[in-house]
Amino acid sequence: MDTFTALTADEERFERHLAEQVWANSKVARAKFRRVAVAIYLLGAAMLSSGAAVLAYRL
């Protein structure tokens, strides 16, 4: 509570602190998005390769 009171007393400091938090959150979200995108592509490739293996086995 004391930190919040200190930050709201100085508006410029509060805005800077808020901007830093938004920037940090956006970096985390971007990293998560990239990892999820890679995981989805790898899952698709695994499904296609397993389907191809089944087709090759049946021939």
UniProtKB/Swiss-Prot annotation:
The keyword Metal-binding does not apply. It is found in: Cell membrane. Keywords: Antiviral defense, Cell membrane, Membrane, Nucleotide-binding, Transmembrane, Transmembrane helix. Pfam families: PycTM. InterPro entries: PycTM (IPR043760). GO terms for cellular component: plasma membrane. One of its GO terms (biological process) is defense response to virus. The chain crosses the membrane at residues 36-56. It is a single-pass membrane protein. Pycsar (pyrimidine cyclase system for antiphage resistance) provides immunity against bacteriophage. The pyrimidine cyclase (PycC) synthesizes cyclic nucleotides in response to infection; these serve as specific second messenger signals. The signals activate the adjacent effector, leading to bacterial cell death and abortive phage infection. A clade D Pycsar system. The effector gene of a two-gene Pycsar system. Expression of this and adjacent uridylate cyclase MePycC (AC A0A1C5G2V9) probably confers resistance to bacteriophage. The genes are probably only expressed in response to bacteriophage infection. Probably only responds to cUMP (produced by its cognate NTP cyclase), acts by impairing membrane integrity. This is Pycsar effector protein MePycTM. It comes from Micromonospora echinofusca.
